[in-house]
Amino acid sequence: MTKPIVFSGAQPSGELTIGNYMGALRQWVNMQDDYHCIYCIVDQHAITVRQDPQQLRKATLDTLALYLACGIDPQKSTIFVQSHVPEHAQLGWALNCYTYFGELSRMTQFKDKSARYAENINAGLFDYPVLMAADILLYQTNQVPVGEDQKQHLELSRDIAQRFNAIYGDIFKVPEPFIPKSGARVMSLLEPTKKMSKSDDNRNNVIGLLEDPKSVVKKIKRAVTDSDEPPVVRYDLKEKAGVSNLLDILSAVTGKTIPELEQHFEGKMYGHLKGEVAEAVSGMLIDLQERYHRFRNDEAFLNQVMKDGAEKASARASQTLKAVYEAIGFVAKP
């Protein structure tokens, strides 16, 4: 029986955070035995906002080394860089012609990013969800792990696939969202009602995977809790968002359940909780960074992983693009 195909990707813009790791990357690693996993570094999406060319090259290799350090195995998964497989852009253009202006106008992420990058509201930013649809549909993907911020884009990908199939027959698999059994939703350290984001301008909200562990300890010790007297370490997302966030992080790193942690911290101060979170997270990062530097310093190996990954991805992508071009009525290249 063939394994279901899973596609996911991350932009090489901005350093990945413990939120990316606990909420996504760790799930990706765990899926490798049961799914045919295709993981992409989406550098073409990254240029919808201005990038420094040297920094983009560096960030792409950094992201690849981080994927590997987190446990993504090129023997089990297809790992590649988006711009190395031209079929993504080619299918993206074709799908543009089956996507309506009004649909793209309704995308909330476009509205958010337009406000944030008001000086550079480019067509690529508007059209981003169509390229994302191409990324997914190229590989006849069965399931896509998505966070809240990308659910709307996956819905659009499904709509485009169904619209195209209604005209031309079953060319595309219609992808389903993959909802992991468990995946920590890591919140901002100082504003625990909003998600930790690698693009947050206030770096005290964020813990980067490549950050100095000493700086991480300081940030966690400054994290928001609450002013209850006496302090009570209890999981309550509504009333105690900061404490709940720290418990979620500690649970994700140690594998202990929330009830076990609540019992452990009964009668203890918030300082005890912060101390244990800081110790657990910094210990995890020291191990991860050691693996990261080993991969990052071996560019020959990274180049081989990218080359092999692009070849594997292209073999699958070219079949889908050929079927699409044939369905549309393009003359085959002699």
Swiss-Prot record:
Q: What reaction gets catalysed by this protein?
A: tRNA(Trp) + L-tryptophan + ATP = L-tryptophyl-tRNA(Trp) + AMP + diphosphate + H(+)
The protein's Enzyme Commission number: 6.1.1.2
Motif 'KMSKS' region is found at: 195-199
Q: Where does ATP bind?
A: Q11, P12, S13, G19, N20, G147, E148, D149, V186, K195, M196, S197, K198, S199
Q: This protein's superkingdom?
A: Bacteria
UniProt cross-references to PANTHER family, sorted A to Z: TRYPTOPHAN--TRNA LIGASE, MITOCHONDRIAL (PTHR43766:SF1)
The text of the family note is: Belongs to the class-I aminoacyl-tRNA synthetase family.
What HAMAP family does the record point to?
Answer: Trp_tRNA_synth_B
Would you tell me the protein name for this molecule? Tryptophan--tRNA ligase
Q: Specify the species.
A: Klebsiella aerogenes
Q: Which gene encodes it?
A: trpS
